[in-house]
Amino acid sequence: MGLEKSFILFSLLVLVLGWVQPSLGKESSAQKFNRQHMDTEGSSNSSPTYCNQMMTPRGMTKGSCKPVNTFVHETLADVQAICSQGQVTCKNGKSNCYKSSCALHITDCRLKGNSKYPNCDYKTSDYQKHIIIACEGNPSVPVHFDASE
């Protein structure tokens, strides 16, 4: 009887771990936004190789070169505050995008035309622009970088 009970408990444990385990290492949309777009510490002003230095460690050159990416050089709190600013329509037609009320320091990274994986080579461009981000959740947090203007 004890062996049967142990087998049943073990089977239940395996079943539960099968459900839970896939979600343990999964990155949330907010975490992905932070990884791909936030650089509160840095600025590309001093380095034309900024994008090349940032894209690989941030996981945007795994399997292919991400063609375009924007880094925001502001505090996370300032970027999160955009989620309560001017609501605009996203490029995909959804209504969960918000435009910053002031221009922010950003760096655009664009894949150079002759660049091919695995040697991803990016052009670095600094700007002061308004950004448009998609926000979700309660509290509302950034989950997608939609545009800059």
UniProtKB/Swiss-Prot annotation:
One MF term in the entry's GO annotations: nucleic acid binding
Catalytic site: 37, 144
Keyword terms of this UniProt record: Disulfide bond, Endonuclease, Hydrolase, Lyase, Nuclease, Secreted, Signal
Record-listed substrate binding positions: 32, 35, 66-70, 91, 110
SUPFAM superfamilies according to UniProt: RNase A-like (SSF54076)
EC id: 4.6.1.18
Localization (cell): Secreted
Tissue expression notes: Pancreas.
Catalyzed reaction equations: an [RNA] containing cytidine + H2O = an [RNA]-3'-cytidine-3'-phosphate + a 5'-hydroxy-ribonucleotide-3'-[RNA]; an [RNA] containing uridine + H2O = an [RNA]-3'-uridine-3'-phosphate + a 5'-hydroxy-ribonucleotide-3'-[RNA]
Gene Ontology terms describing biological process: defense response to Gram-positive bacterium
A Pfam family that the UniProt record links to this protein: RnaseA
Entry superkingdom: Eukaryota
Bridged cysteine pairs (disulfide): 51-109, 65-120, 83-135, 90-97
Keyword Lyase attributed: yes
Gene Ontology CC: extracellular region
Signal peptide residues on this chain, from the entry's feature table: 1-25
Family: Belongs to the pancreatic ribonuclease family.
Reported function: Endonuclease that catalyzes the cleavage of RNA on the 3' side of pyrimidine nucleotides. Acts on single-stranded and double-stranded RNA.
Quaternary structure (record): Monomer. Interacts with and forms tight 1:1 complexes with RNH1. Dimerization of two such complexes may occur. Interaction with RNH1 inhibits this protein.
Protein name: Ribonuclease pancreatic
Natural source organism: Leopoldamys edwardsi (Edwards's long-tailed giant rat)
